[in-house]
Structures are given as structure tokens and as C-alpha cells.
Amino acid sequence: MTYQAPDENGFYGKFGGRFVPETLMKAVKELDEAYRASKTDAAFQKELNYYLKEYVGRETPLYFAEQLTAYAGGAKIYLKREDLNHTGAHKINNTIGQALLARQMGKQKVVAETGAGQHGVATATVAALFNMECTIFMGEEDVKRQSLNVFRMELLGAKVVSVKAGSRTLKDAVNEALRFWVANVEDTHYIMGSVLGPHPFPEIVRDYQSVIGTEARKQHLEKEGKLPEAIVACVGGGSNAMGLFYPFVDDSSVQMHGVEAAGHGLETEFHAATISKGEIGILHGAMMDVLQDENGQILEAFSISAGLDYPGIGPEHSFFRDLGRAEYHSVTDDEAVEAFQLLCRTEGIIPALESSHAISYAVKLASQMRPDESMVVCLSGRGDKDVNQLKERLEGQTND
């Protein structure tokens, strides 16, 4: 059966859709039309591919992690090296595409939200490249955690707005960015950073990130002569995971594993495991699994990794879970930090804390598989941004 989603109303089963105020409906429909037109526009696709190759540096390698594989003692572990993209993460695959779309629609200003700062940096980068005015909303807590990325965005010419409302994290930054878009919708495009938000955003972001899985599928076939038995990626909103998963969706022999942030543990209040612990609700314009209390109030998500502490999850991930097409697991802060150090020492690669969640689960999974089997893990970003935070954490542990 060939997988086809979303439907014409933007639903993935019961998830997704378009729940936006009237003021945004026109902009969302305009975006939908521009996006559909761009898919069959040869000049647009040629330009997109040009920038992905010459500017982002694609395709990224599919690297056989020999020492990590030996450590796990099971299946071969291949790393899809999204950390080697310009700006150091998968985020730029999407921002390049959306900036070109914005230009196509005649919009000279862009706005975005950011958690870890990676999407903010990737948005500020393409805004500089295409000479656009750029405003980034970031929760005050994240501004503190990721001060280096804030400075990077400012260097690139973006205006960074620190959001002091609510939990002062990603969810609140999205709220403020959406408000800003409503007020400036005529000349501004909202570059959504993940497979979230009202239709067509989840579909657009999925399609621009699918380059990850398309390349990985081809590369793995070249290296192993077969498809991998499993693919693994971390999930916050879920764009790097969807980018890896989507091109494999009709390959039923390939198991798909998403890894959420369990923070201090699923039994505590301090986690961001939306699929494990969430319930269906509407957040930021779409129906999705959401962390909420018994009164339907959105709970604060928590993770050591700023890029994973979102209280919702892309609607298509919830749909994959319901279909039984993908499985979702969770990894604690401590396990992610352990995997971070493990990859540094075994492969000489410093991964992002987000990606470390995927590495942690991948090592567990590989150890239960046979040596003639293999898996692809999305190394969604590099860890430069996290080194300081980790230094403080590990020094704190030594001093205790």
C-alpha cells in the first residue's frame, strides 16, 4: 500500500489540520498555493538544489561508525551526518526552501521561533543570504542556555527577541512568533522550524527535510546492497526524524524508531515525552499529541536539550504511531549525556545533545540485533553549542 498523507485538509488521520484565526487563513492558503506551484516549477527546484549542494554542502556522508558498532556489539551503525551541513544541523535544509518560497511570494521579511538556537541561526543565515529582514523569537530561558547562538544570530543581522511569557521556552517563542506574523502578515513569511503548525507547514517541512532520508536510502543501498533493518532519530517537534523516516515509509521491512526526551524520567514531571505521556489537543494551529494537565492546560516540557523541550509533536508522528508504522521510545538526560561522551570517545564526533538521545537508543537497539543487520541513525547536529552546558554539568557532578 502506498502511503498518502496528508489529505486535502491537511489531516494525517485525526491529527494535523488547520486551526488558525481568520487573520492567518489567507496567508496559510497563499503559502499552500505557492508551495504546490513550486513543486512543479523546474526553475525553483533547480535553484533549491543549487543552494543545497553549493551552500549547505549536500549530500552529507553516511558514515559507518565502526568503533561505536564494536562497542554496541551487534548491528552495523551508520550515522547520517547532518552535523556536517553549513550551520551544523539539519535545520538549514528547511530554511533554504522556505526562504526561496518567501521570495517567490514577494515577502522580504521572515520571522521564526527557536529553542536550541539552531533553527534561529539557520533562518538568520538564509535571511542574510537572500537579503531579508529577520526577527527571531526565543524563550528567555533558552536565551540564557544558548547565549552563543544568540550572538551568532545577531552577527548574521537578525533581531533576537527574548520572550518572557509563560515558561520562557520554545512553546512561548512559537506563540509570540505567531502573534508577530498575524500583525505583519502582508510582507512577512513565518519560517516554521519543525513539522508542526497549521497545514501546510508540517508537509512543507517534511518535504524539505526528506532530503535526509532520500540520500540515506540511496547511500545505504550502495554500501550494503540492501535497505537498513532500522532507522533511528531523535524527536522534539520531529523534523529530522520525519526527514529520515518519510522516504522509507513504504519500505515495510525498515523499522522506524523515534526517540523522545525523558528528561529526569517519565515518572517525574520533568520530561518532554509527548508520544508516551501526551493526549490529543490543539497546539499552535494543529491537532496533535500534547503534554497537558487534567484541565487541558499545556504542561511545561523539560529536557537537558533545548531543541527537544516542546510539549507537542508533529501530527504525522502521532499518525505513524497509530498506524504502527513507527515506534517511539524515550531517553533520559543522564543517558543522553552518556551517549554524548561515548560518541566523542569512540568516533571523535561531538554530537548535539538532541542527537545524543538517538545515539543512546541506537546503541541499545544495535546490541539486540545481529551483526549482519544494519541501522541508520540521524546525527541531526553537532554539539559545539552544548559543550559549555555539559562542562558545567560534569564539573557540578565532580564537585558534589
Curated annotation (Swiss-Prot):
**Mind giving the lineage of the organism this protein is from?**
Bacteria, Bacillati, Bacillota, Bacilli, Bacillales
Q: Cross-referenced Pfam families, in alphabetical order?
A: PALP
Record-given protein name = Tryptophan synthase beta chain
Q: Quick one: which pathway?
A: Amino-acid biosynthesis; L-tryptophan biosynthesis; L-tryptophan from chorismate: step 5/5
Q: Does the keyword Amino-acid biosynthesis apply?
A: yes
Q: Which Gene3D superfamilies match?
A: 3.40.50.1100
Q: Which reaction does it catalyse?
A: (1S,2R)-1-C-(indol-3-yl)glycerol 3-phosphate + L-serine = D-glyceraldehyde 3-phosphate + L-tryptophan + H2O
Is rRNA-binding given among the entry's keywords? no
The GO terms describing molecular function are: tryptophan synthase activity
User: Keyword annotations for this protein?
Assistant: Amino-acid biosynthesis, Aromatic amino acid biosynthesis, Lyase, Pyridoxal phosphate, Tryptophan biosynthesis
The record's function comment reads: The beta subunit is responsible for the synthesis of L-tryptophan from indole and L-serine.
List, alphabetically, the SUPFAM superfamilies matched: Tryptophan synthase beta subunit-like PLP-dependent enzymes
Using the record's annotations, give every residue carrying the modification N6-(pyridoxal phosphate)lysine. K91
Which top-level group of life is the source organism from?
A: Bacteria
* Cellular component annotations (GO), alphabetically ordered: cytoplasm
Names of the cofactor(s): pyridoxal 5'-phosphate
Q: What's this protein's family per the entry?
A: Belongs to the TrpB family.
- EC numbers for this chain: 4.2.1.20
Q: How does it assemble?
A: Tetramer of two alpha and two beta chains.
